[in-house]
Amino acid sequence: MTLNPLVQFDIKKLIEIKIFGFDISFTNSSIYMLLASILALTYFYLAFYNWKLVPSRLQVSAEIVYNLVADMLNQNIGAKGHKFIPLFFSLFIFILFCNLLGMTPYSFTVTSHIIVTFALAILVFLTITIVGFVKHSLRFLTLFLPHGTPLWLAPLMIVIELFTYLARPISLSLRLAANMMAGHVLLKVIASFTISLMIYLKFISIPLMVILIGFEIFIAVLQAYIFTILSCMYLNDAINLH
């Protein structure tokens, strides 16, 4: 693992399960997604089960996260977005805990795999599309023709806008997976060099690793935020036809 920084992303079967020829084996990826969900639920249960008017530090931290997501929806969509707070709050928390869990030694970074991030992105994409059609019916299709487009340019613009719309889940998932993978590969490579140089540069190598880990934690939080706020912007397009 020290020599190959990509080994940390290998998916390993722990319990092999096949149903009608479909492989639905329980893997290390499954464990870390389940663990991230359990940790998130435990965190918010402990934060809110004994809610107080004068909040504890844990309650304050949970309220900050909730208000962050609520503000995202309020700023992008307005009052119409309040009903979607549970969805986007769950999305943000799941990605955040998966990212942070991947920072622990010898763990597995679930969000470095495109299949996981694409599943999240396609869930958001389908939800937003359904919301658009339910709210606007066939008028939702006007999203693909910008207002004021000349008639002769309409066919080309429809194709471009449709392609852009369909590319959203791809770009959303690739951005998250690529950033998480790149960050962990870089951290692994530098960590390998740091171990080799500790004999000669121990006063530099250890602080360098601490700085890099801190930066990677920042990236983990930032990527969860970016994924969620872009999803909010896409929902705004569907609701307000922007």
Curated annotation (Swiss-Prot):
It is a multi-pass membrane protein. The chain crosses the membrane at residues 31-51, 84-104, 114-134, 140-160, 189-209, 210-230. GO terms for molecular function: proton-transporting ATP synthase activity, rotational mechanism. CDD domains: ATP-synt_Fo_a_6 (cd00310). It is found in: Cell inner membrane. Signal peptide: none annotated. It holds the Pfam family ATP-synt_A. Keywords: ATP synthesis, Cell inner membrane, Cell membrane, CF(0), Hydrogen ion transport, Ion transport, Membrane, Transmembrane, Transmembrane helix, Transport. InterPro entries: ATP_synth_F0_asu, ATP_synth_F0_asu_AS, ATP_synth_F0_asu_bact/mt, F0_ATP_A_sf. GO terms for cellular component: plasma membrane; proton-transporting ATP synthase complex. PROSITE patterns: ATPASE_A. Gene3D superfamilies: ATP synthase, F0 complex, subunit A. Key component of the proton channel; it plays a direct role in the translocation of protons across the membrane. Belongs to the ATPase A chain family. F-type ATPases have 2 components, CF(1) - the catalytic core - and CF(0) - the membrane proton channel. CF(1) has five subunits: alpha(3), beta(3), gamma(1), delta(1), epsilon(1). CF(0) has three main subunits: a(1), b(2) and c(9-12). The alpha and beta chains form an alternating ring which encloses part of the gamma chain. CF(1) is attached to CF(0) by a central stalk formed by the gamma and epsilon chains, while a peripheral stalk is formed by the delta and b chains. NCBIfam families: ATP_synt_6_or_A (TIGR01131), PRK05815.2-4 (NF004482). This is ATP synthase subunit a. It comes from Rickettsia canadensis (strain McKiel). The gene is atpB.
